[in-house]
Amino acid sequence: TATVDGGTGILVALGATPQDKAGHPLRPGGGSLTELAGFDTAQLNIPAAAVEWVLLTDVTNPATGPDGAAAVFGPQKGATSKDITLLDAALAQLCDICEVDPTTPGFGAAGGLPIGITWLSTLMHGNHSHIHVLPGARMVAESVGLPELIHSADLVVTGEGRFDKQST
């Protein structure tokens, strides 16, 4: 991902507009979420929003805190320490408004994407049972029969986008 916005970019694309206390639309981007008071859903694309969501993640980071989306992945996207503090507070505000536990494993993935999608699923279905946050590597490996391919290979080469404390 290229942003830390808690999934609000997708929500906007689906017609949910983040708003401040005065009912004004927020500026795009994660930093403005510190001002979030709610969402205007008058233009929400209900058929597109009411789907079963399967989010494949490659991390188990929580949304906020020292291991959260802003702290761990913000620097990869060029965030300064000031940006990280702001983005962490913004994601905390989003979690509060969306009634999402910021310590949920995996909710820091993709810039906090599961936060917004959980809110959307709860809005559409009355609960969050229509969102599934799953380990992406395992799901992809199983879908392509990777264990069998590795077993029959002469050489296996893997890669990492950036070697950091998340790398194993």
Describe the function of each predicted region.
Residues 2-168:
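N-terminal loops that bind phosphate or other acidic moieties
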